[in-house]
């Protein structure tokens, strides 16, 4: 990647105030980095403002949380330069041909040992060079009304996006009309468009209305969904899927292979946020018959089934979407095949869904209605749960309220491995890129302190893009021990120094360590040098012409520029030297 520098290490640092796990982390990290000369100016924005800025690379830096997936490629693909386009879905836009090559080799790897080695290599490279810096994985802590039962607790937390199972089978009463599930969101969803939604609030709603081809179970294993079975060719490039028969769209139209072919073909062709990454994997999608399709891949891809199950690739109805610009589709009245039908939405206030009576899983869902309410403040959401106005909330309960919840017999506290990887990112696409600064930041952040202060100790420090809690053996064991002095040293050697004493480092150019020369043994005894009197030195300087001084200055500037010292910094030094010489001349004349 091409180096992009700025005058000083000062960045606008955006954060979402309603997501405390990342927002509080942002405060702590800003203070930690200030100690090594990096200034992050915290600016809290609502998601309706912050997300468009991030998606269009109109930012300097930000703190946020990234939902996890058991598919390593879901994480790694976002670092491919092909996704460095506004609105495509990679917020941090890493542009490195070497990283691209590694990702492409991973996609094609068929040998497990080679696959493992490549994944280790790319994690180490990204950890030391990328503007994406992971901080910690949350531990999910969620409060729910005690009357609800038969929910599933799986990685990611209760009722998270991958947990369709709770929304299918949990209930609180034997009377169907009483099984109305009310959930509080801190902010409204951004989209009902399955092709373009990137936030987990939007995807939570979309996940209930639409279906993917495959899903994962509570053990993170791939299971059939709209696709009932599959076969893989010997060369690993062709996947043939049998589709579920008897499924209907919410408007009564039968679901067929045409819908699947349309969804993936147009999603990729129109470079939509959710499907764009598949352009590097899928060559084409073909209809075999009304209930059989083929995915023909460009190369073998070891994680393809997991990709389909966890990539949020929801199938849409061709008869509704054909001819639309899918990137601009507002989708005001979603029509899916999922367990719930869209009923009503008042933007900024609530969304209502109702049970799909013709859902293809018999007896599901048990819930008859879902009501999402927007309640911005964490304490207000908690009080609404206590009062029975809502049953739970979309994200984890604020840690400061958990102990209070444990004492209430009407509430239950559910813990699980968290879904959210809290991270910070810098805009390396248009604003700043210096891998040495990012490496220094890795050492300057005390992750244990961040976990403790930002999330009450509910979390796990993370140093690389993959982590053992979601990716098992594929996660690197690389760590960066908290060491602010090492961070300072890296910054100094990279040419970042605080030259004006304001606590923020400026760029003066990299320093080149000098290697002392080994003295040679003289062949003849040295004579004792005669030390000239001070006035003799000054007199000599007096006779130095202005032209000579200029020549010396020019020569020194030229020489040092070759080794990377900026001319501006050196010129200032020479001016100071000349002033000192003039003062010495003046003093010498006075003494005469």
Residue ranges with predicted function:
Residues 1-4, 430, 441, 512-592:
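Secretory targeting signatures
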Residues 1-68, 112, 140, 183, ...:
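Ligand/substrate-recognition segments at binding pockets and active sites
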Residues 7-18, 40-43, 177-188, 228, ...:
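Short, well-ordered beta-strand elements
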Residues 17-30, 52-181, 185-189, 199-205, ...:
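Detector for C-terminal structural segments
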Residues 39-41, 46, 328, 358-403:
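Ligand-site clamp/hinge motif
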Residues 146-147, 242, 276-321:
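Surface-exposed binding/hinge segments that line
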Residues 184-232, 265, 335, 455:
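N-terminal lobe/hinge region of extracytoplasmic solute-binding protein
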Residues 228-272, 288, 294, 381-384, ...:
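Aromatic- and charge-enriched surface segment that lines or borders ligand/interaction sites
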